[in-house]
């Protein structure tokens, strides 16, 4: 398949630049895979779409304030973007560095509160290994001085409100540099209402990486190499998923990150084993889903791997018809936008 088959026209004014005042005040498009029906309800109405015996799987990753602004000792402005921590080393991170001159080993960047960032050596891809001194209490320092890593299509600087709103209400495990955005619509009250319908809620963790924003640089999908993201499935969640499937309930993924995690971990019969690993599965039309029965997701960028995943789940023709309806009805797109429930 060609990447160009997943392009569509999106008026720029439909890209949500701010979250709504209330998380669950967004709109929800409903997409029925069997009958092809497309509808619209307030997101709060999602409660009525659940059935007793369903299982809602959420991603409890927590976004770190990964953007740091500083100056080189020579005075030049420098932006450091934390990508991921080097395993076993609390002081050294894989980072992207933006400055007037290309980075080189030994360069020191002066950061707030006397912290220094020293460029060590090239990492993988476009990253550099950077050590932060003093490293003790680094996470607390980062919470005070880092900025939330808003996606590039949000054309403004992150502000104090984004520290709360670009984070799900169930975020627990630090490590993501982008939010699992389908979860941004959920409130504690909504989750309680869903549980009150006889629905279980179970977490997985997938630390969303920068690869979620990376464009596909090949013409054919089959030639694309997917990025890797760390995931963890607790034993209780694996048991809940396997029990739900045995009892005839639906496994409902809250977001593409949950979907990728479960499909990465699933055996051929859909059984899920607890554990951790790296998800590098690339899902596009033709893929047969083993673990996920319904999907809640936002609207995704043209020609993105996430759009291809959702096309595989809904069927490309139905999904693009739904996207056409969403544009015509002036839905809000991307991270701070509206959502759809595909079942």
From Swiss-Prot:
Please state where this protein is localized. Answer: Cytoplasm
Just give the chief location class.
Answer: cytoplasm
Which InterPro entries does the protein's record reference?
QueA, QueA_dom1, QueA_dom2, QueA_sf
Q: Which Gene3D superfamilies match?
A: QueA-like
GO BP, one annotated term: queuosine biosynthetic process
Keyword Lipoprotein among record annotations: no
Give me the disulphide-bonded residues.
Answer: none
So what EC number does this one have?
2.4.99.17
- Any one GO cellular component localisation term in the record: cytoplasm
Arranged from A to Z, the UniProt key words for this protein are: Cytoplasm, Queuosine biosynthesis, S-adenosyl-L-methionine, Transferase
* Gene Ontology molecular function: S-adenosylmethionine:tRNA ribosyltransferase-isomerase activity
Reaction equations catalysed: 7-aminomethyl-7-carbaguanosine(34) in tRNA + S-adenosyl-L-methionine = epoxyqueuosine(34) in tRNA + adenine + L-methionine + 2 H(+)
* Pathway in which the depicted protein is active: tRNA modification; tRNA-queuosine biosynthesis
Q: Which domain of life is it from?
A: Bacteria
The kind of enzyme this is, by top-level EC class, is transferase
Q: Write out the function statement from the record.
A: Transfers and isomerizes the ribose moiety from AdoMet to the 7-aminomethyl group of 7-deazaguanine (preQ1-tRNA) to give epoxyqueuosine (oQ-tRNA).
Q: Return the similarity comment.
A: Belongs to the QueA family.
Database matches in NCBIfam families: PRK00147.1, queA
State what protein this is by name: S-adenosylmethionine:tRNA ribosyltransferase-isomerase
- The record's gene field reads queA
